[in-house]
Amino acid sequence: MRFSSWALVSLVAGVYMSSECFHTEIIGGREVQPHSRPFMASIQYRSKHICGGVLIHPQWVLTAAHCYSWFPRGHSPTVVLGAHSLSKNEPMKQTFEIKKFIPFSRLQSGSASHDIMLIKLRTAAELNKNVQLLHLGSKNYLRDGTKCQVTGWGTTKPDLLTASDTLREVTVTIISRKRCNSQSYYNHKPVITKDMICAGDARGQKDSCKGDSGGPLICKGIFHALVSQGYKCGIAKKPGIYTLLTKKYQTWIKSKLAPSRAH
């Protein structure tokens, strides 16, 4: 999902979310074959979907750091793996309490940088055909015009406040940083840094949106980025902004996971 104006406006499960900046849904996409994206995680509060995430280790989920601000203090969200429908009692679902949140760094108000966070599950997931890991890509360079897929339970129309019940996916196109920072696009508000990338659709008909935050951007089968933010949803010159999994972030991730792999 994404938010704009850097304000949280939409109310979901008692948590304010913005319909403009941080994304919660898929615009112009299609429902995926059930359980064909077994790495997807639904981060929920009181059984309501708030953000997406990616299982990268049996006990670790990667997501967007801004998602943390949507959970009231003293109330811990849960992570659901193996889901396709959020509402159905699917036997392959695995639900976990959260042991801790580890953001890359403290998000600054009005900043778009470093929107990445690790979530450690209280217990390890049981890996099977419906729950699998998505490994980090070794390359993070994306050429302008590259076609990529973004997956999530976010809303399917910009004016909706509710998540999609089923997992959806849409193909978006990479937009160069130079163009995304230009006056006709974001005009450096926010600045699209080397740790970020833009992706959207020339007609504004394909996009991530409210609820898709933290989900993966996959290009040619490689996990490149996480859904972060954007201005509203489905606007051609306000494409989705993604946190690129650069070497800096991958080194940080590996350092945090190292103790887990040692056991």
Curated annotation (Swiss-Prot):
SMART domains: Tryp_SPc. It is an enzyme of class 3 (hydrolase). Residues 1-21 form the signal peptide. It is found in: Cytoplasmic granule. The active site is at H66, D115, S213. Belongs to the peptidase S1 family. Granzyme subfamily. This is Granzyme K. The lineage of its organism: Eukaryota, Metazoa, Chordata, Craniata, Vertebrata. The gene is Gzmk.
